[in-house]
């Protein structure tokens, strides 16, 4: 686990992603992908589509299955959960139009005006551009609006390491600015990243 406490800016996310990817690069892992999103973009997309706020968790649980059941499966489950077909179609249309880069973030910035504070989209673009500018390992960083990271305590950017040779995620994290304050009474911004070392070791052993 790596956590940075007390840093309110996106420097924390940039440092965490670079530290983790540099480590993976030193272990000779290549061509993996950092999937990145922001919980506030997730919520803004749900609000724009007309889903009631109290149902967001249900929407995100279903969205999180996108990799397994695809667009049609997500649409079917959302409608079976009682959501209006119009809202479901409006919601999924955005995912079809968003590209996995800063242009996709810009799309969200403009499309979700009135639902999303533009500084959140700008912050995500800064993270992506900064990581691409100074990274030393061979990997891609991709905006993925379907990335949910199940924990509801995340408050901002969230990210995951997707490794093709493993066929899944080998680590992830995000910003959780409210959690420490709930336990200590002292509001402390925080951002963390964890790696599944067992999976990494398994991949290293398989490689040898």
Residue ranges and their predicted role:
Residues 1-30, 40, 74-208:
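Positively charged, Gly/Ser-enriched RNA/tRNA-binding surfaces
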Residues 36-49, 64-70:
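Short, conserved secondary-structure transition motifs
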Residues 28-34, 53-57:
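Short secondary-structure capping/junction motifs at helix and strand boundaries
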Residues 51-74, 163-166:
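Acidic, His- and aromatic-enriched active-site or binding-groove loops in soluble protein domains
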